[in-house]
């Protein structure tokens, strides 16, 4: 049934009734396993229901419990004592992390620690060599300083990004009302809201925020907006009556920080500050620990591999060096050199810059990223848990269907509502429109004539706002039309009568009759009618028309829409002459025998772009789950309209209805879709929820509490999913914080949701998430290419030391030279790969599996190290031996030459031609070899960056010049190489020497070989999917 027949507060239960709660069970399970601690135990306890019974107590019992008076309030003395005992009515901020600790964390990550160790070794080597008067001591000093600079600069960049994020608790503090009207000792006055205590008697009116959790004692037409707390778009009635055993569903409790829309109310404060529901949510959100992002896990995994290999090879070289007679100091220098060669010093900067670039790209598309690592996480997302109100929907009630003249007509629910197509010539329609316009207390805020009708601000509740805007769009000047029918009497809507009635004089001064109009719950309105208006004629309301009404009502209610009935009655001049004194207390006018005009249904409609966005998510293998505090029928209807429940999918209830069998006789695995409400979720075992998520691909959770949203996210994560949570309300903030990535709405989103989220959609458009997913997948793809490019040169940087120790040739490559490769020439091409376009439709691929699809996997390492890296090593040694031979040192003579070459006292070492070389001349030649090997690596790296443009498609298909940043980076790389080679002063500072032009040409055939070799690899991958070739060579 639709929601017109009841104006109940939907459940936001925090946990269990007598049967216990899923969060509580999970808490017990975790404790039994030995995990937890006080922080976790406290967090789990927050997921339990607020154990209060104030809503069930009589006024006298409340007075006794809180030592207060329902008429005079607390005494000032007792209020002061309670304030001293309980503290102010404010949210307690959590202990913040000191800024120096945040900065220190940026300097102490896995890769940073490895670089600190390398820098320390360099400093130790420099100190020892300096004490011995070694001529090459400056190398190690420069190397140490460069490594420290890299760590500090990248740490400062990361700290700056973190510094821009705001503390989550600040948004909740913004929700605290400034003033509250309180009665103490019988005197009414205003105080700061943070001075309220339990037992205070307070008053509130339309436009006020509820200053605490309040037990309602008296109310007149009071309605509150719980959308920021529960996710519902409809206003909720507040009254003194206890309507539900749960304190969170009864109408006689008003929640702290919710907005009072209209009417007045008086009540007793029963909870303040952190003990209120909003306080518990604030504690829950700030208590949820930040989970590591997938990209952080991937980088840690990569660092572990690199650190292990660096230490393994470094220790091996150290032992070998000691065994063959090197001193401890020289062996430590080898160890340090291997670490420096293996640690990709530029990777830290590369990853940070790549993520920043993509974040800026997303910002241009209305996606603001607060946490850089969240960029890639969104691309890894396999499940999106989306709030309904304001995220999938427009967060405004809109007239969607009308039933008059025995036909259901569809209204336009798009953002501009400009396409009303139903017949507006019928006399019945005119009568219905007259009733819905006059029987309406909502009004436009003045000064909005130039504002489009759907965007105008209206003073009134959501339903009446929808009716007023609909009337304005169809009639024209609705407020002017209303003025032509002056109101003389009114009965506001209340939960007992469930109708609103008003009496008006007619616009024609010659017609002295009065017009009575009524709207309300359809069945309540119909029972007061004796006739029905059909095509302008009043017909008896017989059984046939009652069945027609029931059919239409069930049809609209089944769509999850809120349905209202409308009727009217012309009061005769004889019985109700002009100036007649209508009395709403005495009811001296008829309220039965009315004429039924029709039905109007309203819904918070989906955004126009959402269905297509959901379809794209489905195509990309991403599961969209709706999690809302709204009614199950409404949630299911919206889910079906946007494609979360696809066409033809059935729930267990749908199958039972189709087969006409009880629900318990249906195999749940036959149902593709499933709708679970909060009460059902509360009684489910954790394993049952996980099984439901595994069994039903299409899931909708309705009437859920903030804590249950958190449990749902945790259950999805237990299935191995990377979970994104979208939302805009306060109720969403704990789940936003817990999720792998939280996505908040920028326009309608609360400050709490924005601060809890990792990403903010500035246009509140769910469809923008699809853009984020695509960019996230692209950044992972490009990071993979960048890392593959970065790793390749590790082999040509490592093998010179291997040959140096094992074959005893003069050292081909110096540590400072390696650092220039890492931080100067190669960082620009590496970063430029972040600008590379997607090589195929990545939105047709399934999300990556974090356990299988690693950033650095075996095929990538094998291909980079042992294939492309090996070719680059051959190129380097070819160029090295060429340069040595042209200066008189043939390859065979170089073997075993190292001891004599490095002997400071030997000043007449003969080359292959018999020429004698001093130590200074030999050192000059060694620096020349450093430069030659450096240039060889750089020439091969140009070919390497070109092949890294794609992993599967041919480079010719991708295009060589589409990525202009990469072309510029290659040119810049060559310019830096020339500068280092030919700039005066370089030999004395960084050990770079001018080299002959032909030595630049030696590595070029190897670069061509790299390109051709990779094109053959890609051809095999494309032609033989699933084959050994594909599995081993596709990284």
Curated annotation (Swiss-Prot):
Top EC category: translocase
GO molecular function ontology, one term from the record: P-type sodium:potassium-exchanging transporter activity
Compartment(s) of residence: Apical cell membrane; Cell membrane
Record key words, sorted: ATP-binding, Cell membrane, Hydrogen ion transport, Ion transport, Magnesium, Membrane, Metal-binding, Nucleotide-binding, Phosphoprotein, Potassium, Potassium transport, Translocase, Transmembrane, Transmembrane helix, Transport
Gene Ontology biological process terms from the UniProt entry: intracellular potassium ion homeostasis; intracellular sodium ion homeostasis; potassium ion import across plasma membrane; sodium ion export across plasma membrane
Catalysed reaction equations from the record: K(+)(out) + ATP + H2O + H(+)(in) = K(+)(in) + ADP + phosphate + 2 H(+)(out)
GO cellular-component term (any): apical plasma membrane
Transmembrane segments: 99-119, 143-163, 300-319, 332-349, 784-803, 814-834, 855-877, 930-949, 964-982, 998-1018
Principal location class: membrane
UniProt modified residues of type Phosphoserine: 27, 463, 601, 840, 954
CDD domains: P-type_ATPase_Na-K_like
Positions in the Lumenal compartment: 120-142, 320-331, 804-813, 878-929, 983-997
Pfam family of the protein (one): E1-E2_ATPase
Record field: compositional bias (Basic residues): 26-40
Modified-residue entries (Phosphotyrosine), positions: 7, 10
Known EC number: 7.2.2.19
Disulfide bonds: none
Active site: 387 (4-aspartylphosphate intermediate)
Region annotation Disordered: where it falls in the sequence: 1-41
Residue spans, topological domain Cytoplasmic: 1-98, 164-299, 350-783, 835-854, 950-963, 1019-1035
Membrane topology category: Multi-pass membrane protein
Binding site for K(+): 340-341, 343, 345, 797, 822
Statement: the UniProt record of this protein carries the keyword Flavoprotein: no
Xref: PANTHER family: POTASSIUM-TRANSPORTING ATPASE ALPHA CHAIN 1, SODIUM/POTASSIUM-TRANSPORTING ATPASE SUBUNIT ALPHA
Entry protein name: Potassium-transporting ATPase alpha chain 1
Species of provenance: Oryctolagus cuniculus
